[in-house]
Curated annotation (Swiss-Prot):
Its cofactor is a divalent metal cation. Its main location: cytoplasm. It catalyses: N(7)-methyl-GTP + H2O = N(7)-methyl-GMP + diphosphate + H(+). It holds the Pfam family Maf. This is 7-methyl-GTP pyrophosphatase.
Length: 193
């Protein structure tokens, strides 16, 4: 049986992968996530997703290793995780009534056969008009300081949106399951057996 590894320390990504009911291990890779000068958002998420999976390749021979990474784009700028409540509030104030794009890179490497697949999924969030009070209450309650976009889709973040647009809502949480299943089938592992 093919052995599967998730290259992530994120409990949200593990919860998503659990939905496929496949046995897997997980480990948090340690890579430099700094964007390169003039690197496009697509190139960045491809590089980081593949880099996370590759970082674990030596520890997991004969495995399929999944890596993913996400960026938030607003006004043609890549926004990182807010890190503090003031930045999270400022981001959400900027997003009020606006469209924000998320790109999630996904990579699968097959260490047994020295091959890999890399892609990304796009997902757009259209925020409703938000009051300063709503933003303050949301940030105080959810503390989305380590989340791209300054919100958590898997929590109260859903209350901030007017609508969502994209192929796979799991993309917004950080692991596009539809594309992952396609990649796993290409690698010879059908989640349905």
């Amino acid at each position: 049986m093919t052995r599967l590894v998730l290259a992530s320390g994120s409990r949200w990504r593990r919860q998503l992968l659990d939905r496929l009911e496949l046995p897997y291990a997980w480990a948090a890779p340690d890579i430099d996530e700094t964007p390169h000068p003039r690197e496009s958002p697509q190139a960045l998420v491809h590089r980081l997703a593949l880099g996370k999976a590759t970082a674990l390749a030596g520890e997991y021979p004969d495995h399929l290793i999944i890596g993913s990474d996400q960026v938030c784009l607003f006004d043609d700028q890549i926004l990182g995780k807010p890190g503090d409540a003031a930045t999270a509030r400022a981001n959400l104030q900027r997003f009020s009534g606006q469209r924000v794009r998320f790109l999630t890179g996904i990579a699968v490497i097959d260490t047994a056969h020295a091959r890999h697949w890399v892609d990304h999924e796009r997902y757009d969030v259209i925020f409703r008009d938000l009051s300063e009070t709503e933003i303050a209450h949301y940030v105080d309650r959810e503390q989305p300081l380590d989340s791209a976009g300054s919100f958590r889709m898997e929590g109260l973040g859903i209350t901030l949106f007017e609508r969502l647009e994209g192929r796979d809502p799991n993309t917004l949480i950080g692991l596009p399951l539809i594309r992952l299943c396609e990649m796993l089938r290409e690698a010879g592992l059908d989640p349905l057996g």
